[in-house]
Swiss-Prot record:
The keyword Chaperone applies. This is Ankyrin repeat domain-containing protein 13C-A. One of its GO terms (biological process) is protein retention in ER lumen. Residues 1-19 have a biased composition (Basic and acidic residues). Residues 1-35 are annotated as: Disordered. Its main location: endoplasmic reticulum. Pfam families: Ank_2, ANKRD13_C. The gene is ankrd13c-a. The keyword Protease does not apply.
């Protein structure tokens, strides 16, 4: 069970100019983690059926009128906006907070991008935090520095609070999936039946990784409200990949608990994707979060531009080539910046050395079981010194320079310009919106979710038949749509074969 899995649920809306298109390992170490048994557990393949990706959309949550997230708009001064819920949280006024919750937004961001839940967690104010969680305050939303309330809770180090936030995150995930299901089924029903084949080629600028990165040919069958995905890439993180012969089946007619099935075609077994976790699994995940770096990565698209790629040495002309069966115009993608931040103020020197040893072992193909890497039950940390910042000092601070609340930061930041090429075809039969609906079903595969997020950007005309996307901070993927055809298929390919046996533990990370 890993912290990484709590990031991978898809968004229900198009990203803004500075949306988080890349969120690898936000609350865990980058390369996968480890369990009590010493067995390596990479991030969950099907994590988005566990955790909400963007509870900032008010329609996804129960208390709709409380969940609007509305930071200050450009040109609007802080003196023009009042944040009474934030103020009483910072002051620890639980009685006033319980009154304000009935009539005010508890998902609103202040001028520093913090929600009331952010402040409660940073200050270690359990009463306020639990009251906000009881009213379904969004847990996934990020502040101006890119940190979620869960990330801040890990920094503060109160185990009970981390556990409460993690459970609420999973609950909001289930609500999100249930909310989206009718819309998704309607969109699938309106699509024609088709076969789609696409190829993945992964690359890295890290020499050790470039030798072990996989490629994959994925086959997608869509009929009615059923989808089947055949893949050879069972699990993939930036430090490890697992190959096999896997089929993922979504049956839109089945009950939600029966909709998603994974087939292991080599062992002839299947496993249903479950939604609930045991108490032990949750506690183990908290141990891992508390012993790992807190990580956030954002692909900033504020200054993105597309320019036609050129070909020819003497006489330059716009590059147009065939990709698979489709004629495509090639563009250079400029202005993409990958901003990553890593925090470790909650870790001991022993934790840091241990995590480094794990990464080195994995990069060399080592076996964690042999080296006895086992997470230890983590106790709550000693709280940081009490807050001395007044409300006036906090709210009047310059944007981007908010007084720090909570444990003193130990943060490393890095920026990298991401260079990419994209090929757009006017001939491709499928539209981007239709592709997004299909990808939303198979978004449990993390790399497919990255593809879905990337194509939500405002792209040049046509369909992206070939594109480069960032999958992890050190890894990019070239995705090529090789083949597309409309057609009908045998119903049998969307059902579990009779000779397959159920194995609930076949995919322990599921």
């Amino acid at each position: 069970m890993t912290g990484e899995k709590i990031r991978s649920l898809h968004k229900d809306q198009k990203p803004s100019k500075d949306e988080d298109l890349l969120e690898p390992d936000e609350e865990a170490t980058a390369g996968g983690t480890f369990t009590r048994t010493g067995k390596l557990k990479s991030s969950k393949m099907f994590s988005n059926h566990k955790v909400i990706r963007s509870p900032s959309n008010p329609a996804l949550l129960q208390n709709h009128h409380h969940q609007q997230i509305s930071p200050i708009t450009p040109g609007e001064s802080k003196s023009d906006v009042y944040f009474p819920v934030h103020e009483c949280v910072l002051k620890g006024d639980i009685r006033r907070l319980s009154s304000l919750i009935r009539s005010h937004s508890i998902g609103q961001k202040d001028s520093h991008g913090n929600t009331p839940l952010h402040l409660a967690v940073m200050l270690g104010n359990k009463e306020c935090a639990h009251l906000l969680l009881a009213h379904n305050a969004p847990v996934k939303v990020k502040n101006a520095q890119g940190w979620s309330p869960l990330a801040e809770a890990i920094s503060y180090g109160d185990r009970q609070m981390i556990t409460a936030l993690l459970r609420k995150l999973k609950q909001q995930s289930r609500e999100s999936v249930e909310e989206k299901r009718p819309r998704l089924l309607k969109a699938l029903k309106e699509l024609g039946d088709f076969y789609l084949e696409l190829h993945w080629d992964f690359q890295s600028w890290v020499p050790l990784l470039s030798r072990i990165l996989p490629s994959d040919a994925c086959k997608i069958y869509k009929q009615g409200i059923n989808i089947r995905l055949d893949t050879t890439l069972i699990d993939f993180t930036d430090m490890k990949c697992q190959r096999g012969d896997l089929s993922f089946i979504f049956n839109g007619d089945a009950a939600p608990s029966e909709s998603f099935v994974v087939l292991d075609n080599e062992q002839k077994v299947y496993q249903r994707i479950h939604h609930e976790e045991s108490e032990m699994e949750t506690e183990e995940e908290v141990d891992i979060l508390m012993s790992s770096d807190i990580y956030s990565a954002t692909l900033s698209t504020k200054s993105i531009t597309f320019t036609r790629a050129q070909t020819g040495w003497l006489f330059r002309e716009d590059k147009t080539e065939r990709v698979g069966n489709f004629l495509a115009d090639f563009y250079l993608v400029n202005g993409l910046i990958l901003e990553s931040r890593k925090r470790r103020e909650h870790l001991t020197e022993e934790d840091i050395l241990r995590n480094k040893a794990i990464m080195e072992s994995l990069s060399k193909g080592g076996n964690l079981m042999e080296q006895n890497f086992e997470p230890v039950r983590r106790q709550s940390l000693t709280p940081p010194p009490p807050n001395t910042i007044t409300w006036e000092e906090y709210i009047s601070a310059e944007n981007g320079k908010a007084p720090h609340l909570g444990r003193e930061l130990v943060c490393k930041e890095n920026k990298k310009t991401f260079k990419a090429t994209i090929a757009m075809s006017q001939d491709f039969p499928l539209g981007i919106e239709s592709l997004l609906n299909v990808l939303e079903v198979i978004a449990p595969f993390k790399h497919f979710n990255k593809l879905r997020e990337f194509v939500q950007m405002k792209l040049p005309p046509g369909f992206p038949v070939k594109l480069d996307i960032p999958v992890f901070p050190t890894i990019t993927a070239t995705v090529t749509f090789q083949e597309f055809r409309y057609g009908e298929f045998e119903d049998a390919i969307f059902t579990i074969p009779d000779d397959y046996k159920e194995d609930p533990s076949r995919f322990p990370d599921l």
